[in-house]
Curated annotation (Swiss-Prot):
Homodimer. It comes from Pseudoalteromonas atlantica (strain T6c / ATCC BAA-1087). Pathway: Pyrimidine metabolism; dTTP biosynthesis. This is Thymidylate synthase. Its EC number is 2.1.1.45. Belongs to the thymidylate synthase family. Bacterial-type ThyA subfamily. It comes from the Bacteria.
Amino acid sequence: MKQYLDLCQRIVDDGKWVNNERTGKKCLTVINADLTYNVGNGEFPLVTTRKSFYKSAIAEMIGYIRGYDNAADFRKIGTSTWDANANQNQAWLDNPHRKGEDDCGLIYGKIGRNFPKPDGGSIDLLAKIIYDLKNGIDDRGEIFTFYHPGAFHMGCLRPCMYSHHFSLLDDTLYLNSTQRSCDVPLGLNFNMVQVYFLLAIVAQITGKKAGMAYHKIVNAHIYEDQLELMRDVQLKREPLGMPKLIINPDIKSLEDLETWVTMDDFSIEGYAHHPAIKYPFSV
C-alpha cells in the first residue's frame, strides 16, 4: 500500500503535464515506476484508501486467460471494464473491423492465446508456458504477451499491461509484468491485483511455490479531472491493514480456469477500507 501511495504522491509532486491525443485530456505524468508484491507471503496489494473491487480485476484477468474479445463475455464473469471501450470509443465505432455491439476486436488474451505466426497458424502462448512450468522447464522466454503492433488497428484498445514473464528458480515461480501506460487512480488498483493474482494462480495450477511479482510501469499518470480527488481526498487518508486473498484450492489446471471457475472461487479476509471514490474514466 505504501508503494502505491508513494507513486501517487510522486506524480502529484513531480509529474509533468502531457496532452493525450486519444482522450483529449491533459495527464500529470512520470516515467518509470517499479512495484513489488510478495505473493509467497500472501501480501495482497489491495488499495485501502478507497474501496476497491478486487473481483472485477480478477474477472478481467480470467477473461484474458480465456481469450475473450467481447464485452458481454467479460460481463458474464463479473466485470464491466470493457463496456466503454467496446461501445463508446468513437474511433472503434467507426472502425470497419468492429463486428457490432460489445465487440472488442483483437485485444489482450485474444492475441496471447492465438499469437499469429508469420508462416501461418498461431501459438497458444499461455498453454506453452503452463506446460513448461508444470514440467520444471524455464527456457528464459516464458512470456505471455498481448503486444502485437500489426493487430492494433483491429482492436478497440492497445494493451496497457502487455507482458507477463514467468521465471522458475528451483521450485519457486516469479513474475515480471510490464505495463506501457497506467491510469493510476483508476487502473493501478486493478493492475496490482491482477499481477498478484496471475502469479498466485499460475503457481497453484503448476504446482510451484509463488515467489515475488515485479510490476514495471513505464508511463504513470493522473488525468486532469482526477487530480483534485487524488490530491485532496485519497492522499489525505491513512492506509489500513493488508487483506488476504483466498483462492479455491480445487482450481488445479488451465482447463479449470477456462471452464468452470467463477468469482465465487475467490474471497478476501480482513479487508478494511475507506469509502469509495468515483474517479472519472477516460475512453
